[in-house]
């Protein structure tokens, strides 16, 4: 038995799977308009199966979340998510007009509120986990957590702190 994504066998060595990123927690492959995050065997402090399942049911605009779960030999090994393309010709966020930048941040703030209402902590936000291609995205949920602490407002403050 090998990799299974949403009850379908997949072979990450096929040509249709292209590795597009490599990080501390794993590799990201591109296939058919999706990104597939595959955890390293030695990855620590990563999202667990229960949290990943929970996140697949939440809809956001610019904070990318898992949409299908990846298993290897019946063990949770990663997930697929929306592929956000980086365009090297695209303007950089520093050159973004102020009103456009404000709108991008407002959309992320709306997503932060949605996730805070669902008790999700945005953990591990850093520059490598953001993409700007005319739109601003947070792209790596591998360290997000479910926290049942305090009020939604307290969690939203923590999440805003992670983002800013």
Region locations from a protein language model:
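ATP-binding glycine-rich phosphate-binding loop
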Residues: 1-45, 58-61
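Conserved hydrophobic "DFG−1" position in protein kinase catalytic cores
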Residues: 30, 38, 83, 131-132
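Protein kinase-like catalytic core scaffold
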Residues: 34, 62, 79, 137-140, ...
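Conserved protein kinase catalytic core
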Residues: 43, 88, 146-148
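Regulatory alphaC helix of protein kinase catalytic domains
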Residues: 52-53
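Conserved structural core of kinase catalytic domains
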Residues: 62-104
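Conserved kinase catalytic-core helix
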Residues: 91-132, 136
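C-lobe/activation-segment region of protein kinase-like
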Residues: 97-98, 117, 132-164
């Amino acid at each position: 038995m090998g990799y299974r994504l949403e009850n379908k066998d997949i072979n990450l060595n096929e040509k249709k799977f292209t590795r597009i990123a490599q990080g501390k927690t794993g590799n990201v492959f591109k296939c058919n308009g999706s990104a597939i995050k595959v955890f390293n065997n030695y990855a620590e402090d990563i999202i667990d199966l229960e949290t990943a399942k929970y996140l697949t049911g939440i809809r956001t605009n610019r904070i990318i979340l898992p949409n299908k779960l990846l298993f290897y030999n019946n063990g949770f090994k990663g997930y697929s998510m929306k592929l956000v393309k980086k365009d090297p010709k695209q303007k950089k966020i520093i050159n973004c007009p102020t009103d456009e930048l404000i709108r991008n941040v407002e959309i992320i703030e709306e997503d932060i509120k949605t996730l805070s209402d669902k008790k999700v902590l945005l953990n591990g936000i850093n520059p490598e986990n953001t993409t700007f291609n005319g739109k601003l995205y947070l792209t790596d949920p591998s360290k997000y957590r479910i926290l049942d602490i305090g009020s939604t407002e307290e969690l939203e403050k923590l999440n805003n702190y992670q983002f800013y």
